[in-house]
Amino acid sequence: MNRIFKIACLILAIFLAPQLQAQVKKQPVKKPLISAKKPIKKVVKKPAVKSAKPVTDTVAKEEFTKVKISTNEGDIVIKLYNKTPQHRDNFIKLVKEHFYDSLLFHRVISQFMIQGGDPKSKTSAAGEMLGMGDVGYTIPAEFDSSLYHKKGALCAARTENPEKASSGCQFYIVQGRNISEGELNNIEQQSGIKYSSAKRMTYKMKGGTPFLDMNYTVFGEVESGMEVVNSIAAVPVDNFKRPIKDIRMRMEIILPTEEKTDSKK
């Protein structure tokens, strides 16, 4: 009798096992799918609205230090990038110390750039070759793919060195020229840099010097006074590319209050 009862229980267990297994499978699959949909909708919906404002506010509120470069050809206002803090802070330090006052734009090449910041240029004789003066230290390269050598870019000069470290004081402002699609393709192949459609359009329509990208640190740009850069780039130069007539500079930090006052004039 016991044997018959055991056999009957075994048969019943075999018959019920698939049904129990099916119920176990159905419940976890069914419930999580239903419960997952509602939270996802709420999480996606609300943060999307909330996060949109802070992102816009952050961009709108980002402040840049600006410097006015006064020359006998006119004034140039440059904006220093926050993405290159070491170059920015060093430049601000030198401006506040009046390091650049009375120095020359000592190297000028039309459709390329205008260069200055050699401390020896303050007392140099006419016709003397310049460009070797410095402050005794370099700044580590700060490359960022979003910062490139478009027309008006403010960049750090440097000597040949494997780290591509920048001069502590010498800089150049890009004048450049319009770059063709073919030239950009060649630069991409040679350097491995990939240019977005926006960058390509900038180089083709406004110009620049793309062959210097990711080789020299770009740490600012001309905000106003590009016509002054063009004027300096067009002056007669000697065999050293030094302007025949000295073009001296004087720099000062533009405070936010001064900027607002100037905009009202």
Name the predicted role of every residue range.
Residues L20-K265:
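Cyclophilin-like peptidyl-prolyl cis-trans isomerases
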Residues A8-A17:
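Bacterial N-terminal signal peptides
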Residues M1-C9:
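Bacterial N-terminal signal peptides that target proteins for export
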